């Protein structure tokens, strides 16, 4: 294998690796966006849950059923 052929092979591999790295980076960026949205949704759900518990009292504060 000549030096020129080796250079072409290495440049070709690098081009494919660059494409793969970019594709993986795109996936990571999208996953980060999804995680951020999920964190915001989770925070909103926690806030709603705390508001509901505040309105209706916690489960530990319930009076025992009438048959006790």
From Swiss-Prot:
Name of the gene this protein is made from: slyX
| Cystine residue pairs | none
Q: Which HAMAP family match?
A: SlyX
Name-wise, this protein is: Protein SlyX homolog
- InterPro entries reported for this sequence: SlyX
Secretion signal: which residues? none
Entry's family note: Belongs to the SlyX family.
**Spans traversing the lipid bilayer:** none
